[in-house]
């Protein structure tokens, strides 16, 4: 029986992107690979994962997708029921054919996949779309091995966590928010803390990172699970080659505006500040105005992604002069990989979601980190302290937001005085591309995983032959 891997991402832009790229990479290694998407995404956006195949299942929201759910909790509840049934039906339909699945790789938040896989007798491997460091914190906190420090000691002095398994000491504010408390999304916090609770030392867990970037944390994780970094799962030119003209994951759930690239073409090399806070976060009107005024004060041309739902947060007329003169461009969504690859971009103001952080590192773009919640505070800490590839904005304690002066300071620190961070970002770009190039650290880890799935398929074949249940048309 030939190996056939079923890849199951969470149906959101930030989770789909790396797993689509992973499916492509796995299929390029000669392993039959099928990526699962939802009926809604298949109908409205489409997914190109070639040479991997794509199948659609129900998530219980076939007409409107995630946006049609009343809440995150309601979406996940319906998705668990509908997707479990739909995925099981897909597996069963393939079981008696030469295309039966021999392994499942699933987003580590999609924990409903595990009982489906067990009932089908198929090994299931979690794929983390977060950094190794954030994943480690969630695992160690969830298992009671690492304590989050209190807000303040009795004398008012802050305390730090102890170093543990490759993790450095951290302030409470640097922890991923779900490790501190559930906040407004208790169901997501619960999923975060138990992502790898079932994994033992010999169980595979795949990470969208690369060994050179997080070597100490990865070494620590290997004491608890078979952790392997197989990223960055980003469409990248390999080391020593130029960029490609069109860079895309192949799963655009939003609609990027091509005007971005034409506008960037008119700007000098390294002159533009690119601003985007991802596909989920909403800043609010006051924070949006502070960022806008900070950008204007810094004086660099800027390209800012403001989603349609957030356009009303921008004060009326504030950026009219800048946009009319060509000093600023506001778009609802951008082709981010192409923007980061453009020579005009000199820095990236980012919320430090993991995809955005890893993309910036992989394209050598220094960052201004304005983290908001979940994994972002820890990513921002590492951008500044562990990787020296950017500066971290400090939130004003009284105002509870990033003020315009701090935004201006950070942009100037990177754009005007950022030789060191540009050099560090360039180093990480080179190492990221080397990691996924033939023989690189991530490429070797992916080869190791390919050996695992092929060996498992061979063992399943032997068992089926011994039981006299060889499927028609199967191949060794």
Set out the residue ranges of the language-model regions:
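Glycosyltransferase specificity loop/lid
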Residues: 1-476
């Amino acid at each position: 029986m030939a190996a056939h891997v079923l890849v199951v991402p969470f149906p959101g832009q930030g989770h789909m992107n790396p797993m689509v790229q992973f499916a492509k990479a796995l299929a390029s290694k000669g392993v039959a690979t099928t990526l699962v998407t939802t009926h809604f995404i298949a109908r409205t956006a489409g997914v190109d994962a070639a040479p991997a195949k794509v199948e659609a299942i129900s998530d219980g929201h076939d007409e409107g997708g995630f946006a049609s759910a009343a809440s995150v909790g309601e979406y996940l509840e319906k998705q668990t029921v509908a997707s479990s049934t739909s995925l099981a039906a897909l597996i069963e339909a393939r079981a008696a054919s030469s295309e039966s699945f021999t392994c499942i790789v699933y987003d580590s938040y999609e924990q409903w996949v595990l009982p489906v896989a067990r009932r089908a007798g198929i090994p299931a491997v979690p794929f983390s779309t977060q950094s190794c460091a954030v994943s480690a914190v969630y695992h160690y906190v969830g298992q009671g091995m690492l304590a989050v420090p209190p807000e303040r000691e009795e004398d008012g002095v802050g305390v730090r966590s102890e170093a543990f398994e490759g993790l450095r000491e951290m302030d409470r504010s640097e922890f991923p928010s779900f490790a501190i408390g559930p906040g407004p999304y208790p169901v997501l916090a619960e999923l975060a803390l138990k992502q790898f609770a079932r994994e033992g030392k010999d169980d595979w867990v795949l990470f969208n990172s690369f060994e050179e970037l997080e070597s100490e944390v990865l070494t620590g994780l290997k004491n608890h699970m078979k952790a392997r970094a197989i990223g960055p799962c980003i469409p990248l030119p390999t080391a020593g080659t130029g960029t490609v003209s069109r860079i895309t994951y192949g799963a655009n759930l939003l609609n990027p505006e091509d005007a971005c690239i034409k506008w960037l073409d008119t700007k000098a090399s390294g002159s533009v500040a690119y601003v985007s806070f991802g596909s989920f976060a909403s800043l609010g009107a006051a924070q949006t105005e502070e960022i806008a005024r900070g950008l204007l004060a810094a004086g660099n041309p800027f390209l800012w992604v403001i989603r349609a739902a957030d356009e009303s947060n921008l004060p009326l007329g504030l950026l009219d002069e800048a946009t009319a003169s060509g000093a600023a461009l506001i778009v609802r969504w951008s082709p981010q990989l192409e923007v980061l690859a453009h020579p005009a971009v000199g820095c990236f103001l980012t919320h430090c979601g993991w995809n955005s952080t890893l993309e910036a590192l992989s394209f050598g773009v220094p960052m201004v980190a304005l983290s908001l919640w979940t994994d972002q505070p820890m990513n921002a800490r590492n951008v500044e302290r562990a990787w020296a590839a950017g500066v971290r904005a400090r939130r004003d304690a009284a105002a509870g937001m990033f003020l315009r002066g701090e935004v201006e300071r950070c942009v100037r620190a990177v754009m005007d005085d950022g030789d060191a961070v540009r050099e560090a970002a360039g180093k990480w770009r080179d190492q990221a591309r080397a990691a996924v190039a033939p023989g690189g650290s991530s490429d070797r880890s992916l080869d190791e995983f390919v050996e695992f799935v092929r060996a498992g398929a061979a063992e399943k074949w032997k068992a089926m032959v011994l039981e006299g249940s060889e499927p028609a048309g199967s191949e060794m």
